[in-house]
Amino acid sequence: MTLIFIMISAIFVNNFVLSRFLGICPFLGVSKQVETAVGMGVAVTFVMALASAITYVVQYAILDPLSLGYLQTIAFILIIAALVQLVEMIIKKSSPSLYQALGVYLPLITTNCAVLGVALINIQNEYNFIETIFNGVGAALGFTLAIVLFAGIRERLETSAVPKALEGFPIALLTAGLMAIAFLGFSGMKLG
């Protein structure tokens, strides 16, 4: 049951975009259309889930036994960069239109602080391997949920009468803030 709690917490209560403000760049940059938001969400989910598992193994099989903890951040960034390259090659071959739509934001997953943040928090919270995977997948699903909801709202705002001073980025920031407040409501949720 604790695995479900870890996942639900990562999706709703500790959403990395809306409560920890990690991954804001792709959240704001790729959320203009639902289709591209879903594509980015799937790519981040794949990278974050694999990065969580691989960084756990690297931390406890290599870095800790060899007392190389000071290389943790560099090692994790290299792992994430390699995974992003893999995802980029897969998307380029399987969906050229999605690859084109994601544009510069796909390589930016390498520097997406949410992916690195999840890997580091998994180690900091001393999760075991299974808990690490559940937290990584939950965090990725939370990112995907947030970016897809935000993209849906932004699509609707494009056809709405928005005051001139709030058109574009200002209304996007206000909307993101309101979403963060809405997700804050989950923090009082009692599970079990």
Swiss-Prot record:
<comment type="function">
    <text>Part of a membrane-bound complex that couples electron transfer with translocation of ions across the membrane. Couples electron transfer from reduced ferredoxin to NAD(+) with electrogenic movement of Na(+) out of the cell. Involved in caffeate respiration.</text>
</comment>
<feature type="transmembrane region" description="Helical">
    <location>
        <begin position="38"/>
        <end position="58"/>
    </location>
</feature>
<keyword id="KW-1003">Cell membrane</keyword>
<feature type="transmembrane region" description="Helical">
    <location>
        <begin position="169"/>
        <end position="189"/>
    </location>
</feature>
<comment type="subunit">
    <text>The complex is composed of six subunits: RnfA, RnfB, RnfC, RnfD, RnfE and RnfG.</text>
</comment>
<keyword id="KW-0812">Transmembrane</keyword>
<keyword id="KW-1133">Transmembrane helix</keyword>
<keyword id="KW-1278">Translocase</keyword>
<dbReference type="InterPro" id="IPR011293">
    <property type="entry name" value="Ion_transpt_RnfA/RsxA"/>
</dbReference>
<feature type="transmembrane region" description="Helical">
    <location>
        <begin position="4"/>
        <end position="24"/>
    </location>
</feature>
<feature type="transmembrane region" description="Helical">
    <location>
        <begin position="133"/>
        <end position="153"/>
    </location>
</feature>
<dbReference type="Pfam" id="PF02508">
    <property type="entry name" value="Rnf-Nqr"/>
</dbReference>
<feature type="transmembrane region" description="Helical">
    <location>
        <begin position="71"/>
        <end position="91"/>
    </location>
</feature>
<dbReference type="InterPro" id="IPR050133">
    <property type="entry name" value="NqrDE/RnfAE_oxidrdctase"/>
</dbReference>
<comment type="similarity">
    <text>Belongs to the NqrDE/RnfAE family.</text>
</comment>
<keyword id="KW-0813">Transport</keyword>
<keyword id="KW-0249">Electron transport</keyword>
<dbReference type="GO" id="GO:0005886">
    <property type="term" value="C:plasma membrane"/>
</dbReference>
<keyword id="KW-0472">Membrane</keyword>
<protein>
    <recommendedName>
        <fullName>Na(+)-translocating ferredoxin:NAD(+) oxidoreductase complex subunit A</fullName>
        <ecNumber>7.2.1.2</ecNumber>
    </recommendedName>
</protein>
<keyword id="KW-0520">NAD</keyword>
<feature type="transmembrane region" description="Helical">
    <location>
        <begin position="101"/>
        <end position="121"/>
    </location>
</feature>
<dbReference type="GO" id="GO:0022900">
    <property type="term" value="P:electron transport chain"/>
</dbReference>
<dbReference type="InterPro" id="IPR003667">
    <property type="entry name" value="NqrDE/RnfAE"/>
</dbReference>
